[in-house]
Regions:
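Transmembrane-lumen/periplasm boundary regions of multi-pass, lipid-linked membrane glycan transferases
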Residues: 40-43, 47, 52-194
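The feature captures the transmembrane alpha-helix scaffold of multi-pass secondary transporters
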Residues: 34-39
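Short acidic/glycine- and proline-prone juxtamembrane loop motifs at membrane-interface regions
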Residues: 2-9, 193
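Membrane-interface transmembrane helices that cradle and orient dolichyl/undecaprenyl
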Residues: 17-33
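Helix-capping/transition residues at the boundaries of transmembrane alpha-helices
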Residues: 1-3, 44-45
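Alpha-helical transmembrane segments of multi-pass inner-membrane proteins
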Residues: 13-20, 150
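Membrane-embedded alpha-helical segments of multi-pass membrane proteins
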Residues: 8-16, 57
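Residue-level recognition of membrane-helix boundary sites in multi-pass small-molecule transporters
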Residues: 10, 32-33, 51, 106
Length: 195
């Protein structure tokens, strides 16, 4: 239990929301909004911040765009889902602000906005853009050694493009989710190995 972190709860909420959004899209967006995904995004936001809304909505939006499912409709649905997901956290944040005042607001801004923008009032695990490109393979050793022959092999770009075109829905979702999360966490200057 000493190794448990709030990041694990955030990951549970985000992964669950991503899968529920994907399932909702696959079923033709029936039954209005994806209420369980919205609840998980709200809980994730209470756990660690708005990233729990941003990433699942971004993954669902990119997947829909790649499938040519209508960018305007998807933009509206994801924006609406994000706004509804903010209701529960907004109530909590309002109560916290009423109790703590500007110190709560400053902490929220410091941990969510300034950390992402690299404008924190203190140095917090600052690493360059390259950090996760090194840490991910290092963290997956010795299995990354098995990937070296694939990386060193001369690639047939036509075959690679064809492979991407023939991906099924689940493969597209998995690839988009992994890439969106990886790229998102590479952006902030504050990076840690636990992310």
């Amino acid at each position: 239990a000493s190794a448990c972190r709030v990041d694990m709860v955030l990951t549970l909420c985000m992964a669950g929301a991503m899968m529920l959004l994907e399932s909702w899209q696959e079923r033709g967006r029936k039954f209005g909004l994806p209420w369980m995904a919205i609840l998980l995004m709200s809980l994730g936001t209470l756990t660690k911040g708005p990233v729990a809304i941003v990433l699942p909505c971004a993954v669902a939006w990119v997947c829909a765009l790649l499938r040519r499912e209508g960018w305007l409709r998807e933009t509206i649905l994801m924006a609406l889902s994000a706004v509804v997901s903010l209701i529960l956290p907004a109530l909590w944040y309002y109560a916290a602000y009423q109790q703590q005042g500007d110190s709560f607001l400053q902490l929220f801004m410091e941990e969510n906005v300034y950390r992402f923008l690299g404008k924190m009032s203190y140095q917090s695990h600052e690493n360059g853009l390259w950090y996760y490109f090194v840490m991910l393979p290092a963290g997956l050793l010795p299995w990354t050694l098995m990937v070296l022959p694939v990386i060193c092999k001369r690639w047939n770009m036509q075959a690679v493009r064809e492979r991407f075109r023939n991906m099924d829905r689940t493969e597209v979702f998995s690839l988009v989710a992994a890439l969106c999360v990886f790229v998102f966490y590479c952006i902030p200057r504050s990076k840690r190995g636990v992310y």
